[in-house]
């Protein structure tokens, strides 16, 4: 403050700090302004689609034989989706996109075995500290992995806030937003931005709810798939070994979104060396629930799978279980996606 008053300091920019930190930093004077969410500064927070495309072309030119594989490598659903203002252009997370390109370059054009930088995974204890109780943590995770959204207030995004408010239950969405864990769907709701964060949050959910994820449950099914390519055992294994661990009362709130996310997390855990994944993928006929596509340069290239999950009420169970073939309308829906 003294330096600005004397004229020795004209402007001081602070980057990479949370508003809660800024509140402490500027508590002695009231001449600080948060510029993060101003339209002119939004693109500083990540890569635009144009910038990410140029970045990929540079990496392809420098570390591979050229740009012929551009469309194959251009996987948008793992690293993009960050929107820092309602209606703003979605951005790529610069940290995890650079992680992918770095691994891609080291492998001389090979797809990294791990698509998620482990440094992004927050210790589950930290989530508990933010929410202050196990009950609050479970409630927050339910909202994100089951309901796929968290309501928020737009004015809270641009306000300075202190440590007490940061840990307030009603402020969780904004706290997660500034930690890079959620993004804006619209003026009212936040969501997980991409498959990377969905995978991380499903992992949190499983750990917090004591869902066993050990290899003995899943490897005996996923390993044979890499040879025989039989998809049905993967689905059966998911329902028996994963969903079979949940108590009956949990199924009162489980929905299609949870099924999509948890099935994706399980498959990607064991098959990410061979396939890339997408959920709620836009197609000419609508949005498919789940898709897995063989990675270019592997034996699985052009081996594509598409799944459409259907939710039925308990009273319909007997009729559905009696069927010995898919319903014609469901087959037609999947064929339209293909």
Residue ranges and their predicted role:
Residues 1-10, 337:
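Substrate-engagement module of ASCE P-loop NTPases
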Residues 2, 54, 58-62, 265, ...:
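A generic structural signal for well-ordered alpha-helical segments enriched in polar/charged residues
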Residues 2-5, 77-83, 167-174, 178-179:
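Short alpha-helical segments and helix-capping/turn motifs at coil-helix boundaries
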Residues 5, 30-34:
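Short, surface-exposed basic-aromatic patches at helix termini and helix-loop junctions that form
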Residues 10-17:
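Structural recognition of the conserved hydrophobic beta-strand(s) that form the central parallel beta-sheet
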Residues 21-27, 35-102:
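Amphipathic alpha-helical segments of the small helical/lid subdomains adjacent to P-loop NTPase cores
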Residues 32-33, 90-327, 331, 338:
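Extended alpha-helical interface modules used as scaffolds for assembling large macromolecular complexes
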Residues 49, 53, 328-334:
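Amphipathic alpha-helical transducer elements in NTP-driven molecular machines
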């Amino acid at each position: 403050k003294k330096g600005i008053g004397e004229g020795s300091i004209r402007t001081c920019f602070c980057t990479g700090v949370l508003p809660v930190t800024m509140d402490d930093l500027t508590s002695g004077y009231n001449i600080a302004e948060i510029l993060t969410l101003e339209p002119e500064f939004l693109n500083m927070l990540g890569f635009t689609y144009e910038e990410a495309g140029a970045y990929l072309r540079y990496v392809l030119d420098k570390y591979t034989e050229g740009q012929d594989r551009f469309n194959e490598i251009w996987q948008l659903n793992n690293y993009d989706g960050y929107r820092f203002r309602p209606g703003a252009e979605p951005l790529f997370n610069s940290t995890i996109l650079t992680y992918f390109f770095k691994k891609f370059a080291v492998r001389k054009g090979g797809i990294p075995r791990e698509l998620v930088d482990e440094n992004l995974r927050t210790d589950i204890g930290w989530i508990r500290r933010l929410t202050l109780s196990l009950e609050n943590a479970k409630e927050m995770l339910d909202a994100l992995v089951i309901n796929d959204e968290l309501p928020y207030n737009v004015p809270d995004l641009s306000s300075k806030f202190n440590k007490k408010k940061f840990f307030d239950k009603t402020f969780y969405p904004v706290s997660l937003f500034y930690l890079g864990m959620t993004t804006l769907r619209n003026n009212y709701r936040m969501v997980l931005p991409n498959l990377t964060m969905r995978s991380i949050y499903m992992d949190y959910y499983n750990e917090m709810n004591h869902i066993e994820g050990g290899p003995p449950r899943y490897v005996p099914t996923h390993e044979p798939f890499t040879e025989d390519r039989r998809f049905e055992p993967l689905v059966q294994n998911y329902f028996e070994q994963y969903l079979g661990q949940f108590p009956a009362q949990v199924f009162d709130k489980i929905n299609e979104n949870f099924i999509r996310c948890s099935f994706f997390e399980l498959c990607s855990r064991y098959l990410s060396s061979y396939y890339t994944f997408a959920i709620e993928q836009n197609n000419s006929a609508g949005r498919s629930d789940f898709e897995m596509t063989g990675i270019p340069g592997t034996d699985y290239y052009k081996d594509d799978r598409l799944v459409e999950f259907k939710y039925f009420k308990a009273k319909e169970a007997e009729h559905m279980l009696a069927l010995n073939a898919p319903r014609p309308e469901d087959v037609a829906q999947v064929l339209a996606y293909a």
